[in-house]
């Protein structure tokens, strides 16, 4: 009960920050972005619900409005916010097989050629005191040379304090990979929480978020489950459970509608509560070894692509392709 009260108080504090007008006074900020307001009718989509061998295509993609800059790369899709020079969200499916890294980090940060308005650059971050923090982590994209290269696009970066990026944020990324291993595949959406009065860095005025979020959906039968996180852009020694919230809570502070392609009743059930005991909290991604021999599913989607999931079923097909 004490934990729930603390969590409720923490969420209320975030909401006050968002709707009262930013987390720092003007006296402490020499550079600010103009006030940002999300239109009440801004959530729309060009993705349709598309059934393919019982799979929901593009399940990881949040609602977006017509005119939003949506960029698709090999391993992830993002919504780019030109005002703040970073993504509103980065979304991807992460399978157990993809967590087994085949390619090392390039550490070569690149301007994203697919962002029509131009992304941030290395000069924006130089001597700023902030890390070029990955939204979709490089360790999630090590399953091909292309995905690893694309994970270093500046459209996938956000200014993060070193203690946060190399500490609790990295720990959460590792935990998410553990969940992908345990559940065969999960859907991940991650990004910054934009508020009024954010400081900026560089000539392109890259906004410095005060908070970041992740939402995760396990859509593997029999135990469907979802969870969200909101973390301050600061170092922390608190356990990750302290920052766990419902997906609905993340939607309230970001204005983003996650996993909207689910049936309404199912979406409501998965997003309204957070069940921390439903998830394991010890990262095992580095030493993960399957108890069975898993292979890539031999199922083919309607688009003609081979299913990315792994399976230990004797027929070589995952549950969705039985």
What positions do the PLM features span?
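Core hydrophobic alpha-helical membrane-spanning segments
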Residues: 15-17
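Domain-level detector for secreted/extracellular nuclease and nuclease-toxin modules, and
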Residues: 2-13, 22-296, 303, 314, ...
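Feature captures the catalytic cores and cofactor-binding loops of soluble hydro-lyases/lyases
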Residues: 311
């Amino acid at each position: 009960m004490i934990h729930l009260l603390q969590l409720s108080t923490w969420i209320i504090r975030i909401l006050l920050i968002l709707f009262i007008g930013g987390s720092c006074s003007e006296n402490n900020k020499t550079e600010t972005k103009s006030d940002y307001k999300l239109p009440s009718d801004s959530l729309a989509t060009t993705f349709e619900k598309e059934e393919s061998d019982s799979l929901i295509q593009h399940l990881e993609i949040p609602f977006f409005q017509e005119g939003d800059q949506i960029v698709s790369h090999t391993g992830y899709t993002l919504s780019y916010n030109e005002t703040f020079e970073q993504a509103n969200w980065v979304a991807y499916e992460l399978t157990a097989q993809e967590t087994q890294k085949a390619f090392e980090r390039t550490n070569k940060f690149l301007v994203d050629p697919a962002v029509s308005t131009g992304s941030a650059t290395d000069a924006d971050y130089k001597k700023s005191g902030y890390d070029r923090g990955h939204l979709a982590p490089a360790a999630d994209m090590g399953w091909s040379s292309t995905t690893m290269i694309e994970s270093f696009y500046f459209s996938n970066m956000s200014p993060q304090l070193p203690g946060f990026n190399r500490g609790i944020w990295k720990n959460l990324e590792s935990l998410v990979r553990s969940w992908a291993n345990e559940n065969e595949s999960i859907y991940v959406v991650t990004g910054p929480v934009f508020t009024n009065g954010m400081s900026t860095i560089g000539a392109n005025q890259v906004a410095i978020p005060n908070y970041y979020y992740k939402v995760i959906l396990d859509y593997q039968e029999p135990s469907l489950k979802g969870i969200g996180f909101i973390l301050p852009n600061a170092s922390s020694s608190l356990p990750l459970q302290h920052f766990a919230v419902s997906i609905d809570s993340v939607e309230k502070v970001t204005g983003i509608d996650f996993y909207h392609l689910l049936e309404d009743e199912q979406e409501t059930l998965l997003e309204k509560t957070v069940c921390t005991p439903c998830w394991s909290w010890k990262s095992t991604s580095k030493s993960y070894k399957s108890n069975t021999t898993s292979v890539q599913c031999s199922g083919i989607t309607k688009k003609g692509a081979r299913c990315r999931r792994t399976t230990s079923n004797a027929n070589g097909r995952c549950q969705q392709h039985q």
